[in-house]
A protein has these predicted regions:
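Glycine-rich anion-binding loops of enzyme active sites
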Residues: 1-41, 177, 188-190
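Glycine-/charge-enriched secondary-structure boundary and capping motifs
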Residues: 2, 52-68, 72-194
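Secondary-structure boundary elements
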Residues: 21-22, 49, 84
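Short, compositionally biased
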Residues: 40-51
Length: 194
């Protein structure tokens, strides 16, 4: 068994903790490349109960190859944006999904309104949903659904931020906005599976 940890150090004034988030900011999705590190208990149970899932192919890969893709590293593409005044928040989408992670960086008087219909759901999640007959609410709570990181930025910075990320092959896109609220993430719309 292999176990690893990473520890980072950052100057306090450079921490991107969400405290600069403003009403009207946009929420960007940075795509994931698969399950990353979450949802494996559900997937393992699914493989035990429905072993035929192992015969599935996902975008030319076996099901096992698709679920075992290494977690994408976002550091190289993000480091050039650190220190940018218009970058107000970052949330890594892990267990708890968008709702359970984006809310952690929201100021107390604000909420994020996210249209899940805008999420570019990866095909692997469609296979998991189909075999497990998993409700969308559970899919959104368990998996990243194709969103590895959410980024909160001023709308005026959108062209510069997306152009920067595109240089690294990352096609970031808008999934929501910051509104008045109570530190919650409001999910609207309907997931669209490929």
């Amino acid at each position: 068994m292999l176990n690893a940890s990473i520890l980072g150090v950052v100057d306090k004034e450079r921490i991107i903790d969400g405290s600069k988030i403003e009403i009207g900011d946009v929420v960007l999705a940075l795509p994931s490349n698969g399950l990353h590190t979450n949802g494996y208990s559900l997937v393992r149970k699914l493989m035990e109960e429905k072993p035929e899932i192992l015969k599935e192919t996902v975008e030319g890969e076996s099901f096992l190859e698709a679920i075992l893709k290494p977690h994408q590293c976002y550091y190289q593409m993000l480091k050039g944006l650190f220190g940018m005044e218009e970058l107000h928040g970052l949330a890594h989408i892990t267990g708890g999904g968008i709702e359970g992670n984006l809310n952690r960086i929201l100021p107390a008087n604000m909420s994020a309104k996210v249209d899940v219909g805008n999420i570019r759901v990866l095909p692997i999640f469609g296979v998991i949903k189909r075999y497990g007959q998993v409700p969308d609410s559970d899919m959104l709570r368990t998996f990243n659904m194709g969103v590895g990181i959410t980024m909160v930025v001023k709308p005026s910075a959108l062209p510069a931020v997306t152009a920067h990320l595109r240089q690294f092959g990352c096609e970031a896109y808008v999934i929501g906005e910051i509104v008045e609220g109570n530190q919650t993430v409001v999910l609207e719309g309907q997931l669209q599976y490929p």
